[in-house]
Amino acid sequence: MDLERLSPRNPVKKESWWTVLTLAYQSLGVVYGDLATSPLYVYKSTFAEDITHSETNEEIFGVLSLIFWTLTLIPLVKYVFIVLRADDNGEGGTFALYSLLCRHARISSLPNFQLADEDLSEYKKNSGENPMRLKVPGWSLKNTLEKHKFLQNMLLVLALIGTCMVIGDGVLTPAISVFSAVSGLELSMSKQQHQYVEVPVVCAILILLFSLQHYGTHRLGFVFAPIVLAWLLCISTIGVYNIFHWNPHVYKALSPYYIYKFLKKTRKRGWMSLGGILLCITGSEAMFADLGHFTQLSIQIAFTFAVYPSLILAYMGQAAYLSKHHVLQSDYRIGFYVSVPEQIRWPVLAIAILAAVVGSQAIITGTFSIIKQCTSLGCFPKVKIVHTSSRMHGQIYIPEINWTLMLLCLAVTVGFRDTKHISNASGLAVITVMLVTTCLMSLVIVLCWRKSSLYALAFIFFFGTIEVLYFSASLIKFLEGAWVPVALSFIFLLIMYVWHYGTLKRYEFDVQNKVSINWLLTLFGSSNLGIVRVHGIGVINTELVSGIPAIFSHFITNLPAFHQVVVFLCVKSVPVPHVKPEERFLVGRVGPKEYRLYRCIARYGYRDVHKDDVEFENDLICSIAEFIRSDKPLNYSPDPENESGINERLTVVAASSSNLEGVQIYEDDGSDKQEPSSSSEVIMVAPSPRFKKRVRFVLPESARIDRSAEEELTELTEAREAGMAFIMGHSYVRAKSGSSVMKKIAINFGYDFLRRNSRGPCYGLSTPHASTLEVGMVYIV
C-alpha cells in the first residue's frame, strides 16, 4: 500500500475521483481499524456491572440510542465536518493543532526561532489573508498568549497531555482489541477452560504483533484494507440479519427519547455506564492524526459511506438480538459473539482477530510517529528511529518504544485479565485526547480561522459538554482500571517536560556564553597565537543560529588548530510539518570573505525525514558552493545580538538533490568514471598525491562567476577532498548553586538520567560517526 505515491503532498493539482476513492479504500486499513473493532466490546463493557439487561428493553434501547448519537455527533459532526478542516498543510493530530497555534500567535516551544522561518512557504496557511482581518477577540487572545510565558507553558502542557494519552492508548488498545476478539472462544468451551486459555492466547498474539514491528507494515499493508473491509461487511451483514430476524422495529430506539427513558430509570448507574458507551468512538482521533497520508475528502468518504453505516447496523443488530434474549446463561454472554449465528462463529472469530491486529497496528505505528514528532520539537529524549521503507516516509520503527509498549501491554493484560478494567482505562485515555482536541480547536477557530469568539464558545460548549459528561463517567472508575492511563500519562508527561526544560536551559547557557565574533576574527587574523590551520572542512554543530558557540573556543583552547574551511552548522526543527528541499538551507558568512567561515542552518519540519550522512554532506557542501557562486543574499535576517556589529546575512539555498539548475558535486577516486557534461563549467583542482578522493563542482551552463568566487570554490574543493570533520558538544548539565530544590532534582537527576540513557548528540543529525569528534562541556544552568 504505497501511501507516499498517492499522498496529497505530492505536486498534484487536483486529485481525480479514482485517486480519492483509492485513498478512501486504503484509509480503511490505516485509519479505521480501531474504530471498526469497537462493536466487539462496547455492549460487554457497558453491561459489565453498572446496569443490567431487563425485559422492558429500556436499558438496551437507551444504550443503542446513546451509541447512535455519540457516533453521529463526535466522529461524524465534530471530526469529519469540523476538525479535519484544521489541518497543518495536510497534516493532522495534536501537534498539528499546536503548531498552527504557535505560528499564528507567534509563540514557539523551540528556542532557536528566526524571523526567516516565517518566509517558509508552509509556515502560513492561507498566507494570502490579511492579518488585519483578525477580529478584536482574536487580537486580544493573540497578544495575551504572546505576553504571558505561563500561558504558553500551559498550552504546551495541554498538547503534551493529549500526546501522552495517545501513547497510553497505544498500550491499552492492543490489549482490549485482541482480548475482545479472542473472547469468542468462550462460546466453544467451558468457563473453567476458557479462563486458562484466553490470557495465554492474547499474550501470544501481542508478543507476535510487537515482535514483527521491525519488519515494517509496508510489506503487509496491502492486506490491511481488505481485512477491515471484510470485517465491516461481516458485522453489517450480521447486523441486518439480526434486525430482520429478531426485531425489525429496533430502529425506533434511535430516537433521543430512549436516552431520556434510560437515564430516568437508571439514574446514577446509567451515568456510570457511559464509560463503556464511549468506547464506541475509540479510534476516532485517528481520522485526524493520520490525515497526512490521505486527503480530507477520502477520509470523509470512507467514514460517511462505509464505516459509519456499518457500525450503526452492527450496534442495531446486537440490540435487536438482545431485545429478544433477556435470560442469558452467564454474565459474559452479553457481548458481540452471542449475536453471531452459530454456523459462522469460527470464520467471524478469525476475521475479528485479524481486524483487531490491524487496529492495534495502527495505534502502534501512530505512537511511533508521535514520539518522533516530540523528539523533533525537543520534547522527548533522542531515540533510535529506523525507517522500514524507502518509499513511505511515515513508516518508522522505534525499538525502545516498541518493547516498552509490549511490556506494558502484557502487564495490563495479565494484571487485569478481563476487558472490564481495560475498557475503563481505555475510555479515559480516549476521552481525554478528545477533550484536548476540543480545547485546541476552540483556539484555532479564533486565531487561525479568524472567526468570532462566539463560534469558539459554541464549539467548546456543545462538544465539551458531551465529552466532559463522558470524562466524568470514566474518571469515577479511577480505582477500577482508569488509573492506568493517568499513571502512564503522568510518567510520559514528566519525561517530556523535564527533557524540554533541560533543553531550554542548555540553550540559554549557550546563548549567554557564546563567544564574541571579534574574538574569532582576532584569532583567525593573528599569526602569533600558534594556531595551525589544517586541510579539510570543520563542521561545528551547534544549536545557535547566531554567534559562536562556546564549544568552539573550548576546542581551540585544548587543541590549537582548525580547518581551512569552517562551517557553523545548526540543524533545527521548525513548527511546520515539512520543509521543502529548496528552502532547507540558510547559508551566510561569518566575518570577512577571506577567512572562509560560513554559517549554515538546515531546517526540518516535525514530520521530515533526515537524510543519510553522505547525501546530507553533499547537500551541505553544494549549498555553500551555490552561496559562493550567487553571493547575493535573497532572504536574510540581521542578527540583533551580534556583538561585533557585523550582520550575518543568510541566503536561502536549495539542496543540490532538489536543485538541478544549481551547483552539483561529483566525487570519485580519480578514475574519471563519471564525467560531467562538457557544456557545463567545472571547478576542480589538480589531483593531489595526499588525497585519493577527487571532487569537482559542476556549475550551470549560464553561470558566470568572478575571480574571487572561483578561488573560493577551488579552496572549498580542496578542503572537501581532504575530508570533513564534525565537531559537536557533549553536554553535562548541572544546576547552579542556589537553585531551588525542584530545579536541582529536575536537572541534576531527571535530565541527567534521561541524557545518559538516550542516544548521543550526534544521533539523528545525519553526520558520519567515523568523522565525528565530541567535545565535553559542563553546563551550569
Curated annotation (Swiss-Prot):
GO terms for cellular component: plasma membrane. The keyword Glycoprotein applies. Residues 1-16, 84-155, 217-219, 295-296, 369-395, 448-455, 499-781 are cytoplasmic. It is a multi-pass membrane protein. Belongs to the HAK/KUP transporter (TC 2.A.72.3) family. It comes from Arabidopsis thaliana (Mouse-ear cress). Probable potassium transporter. GO terms for molecular function: potassium ion transmembrane transporter activity. Coiled coil: none annotated. Glycans are attached at N424. The chain crosses the membrane at residues 17-37, 63-83, 156-176, 196-216, 220-240, 274-294, 297-317, 348-368, 396-416, 427-447, 456-476, 478-498. The keyword Transmembrane applies. The gene is POT8. InterPro entries: K+_transporter, K_trans_C, K_trans_N. Residues 38-62, 177-195, 241-273, 318-347, 417-426, 477 are extracellular. This is Potassium transporter 8. Its main location: membrane.
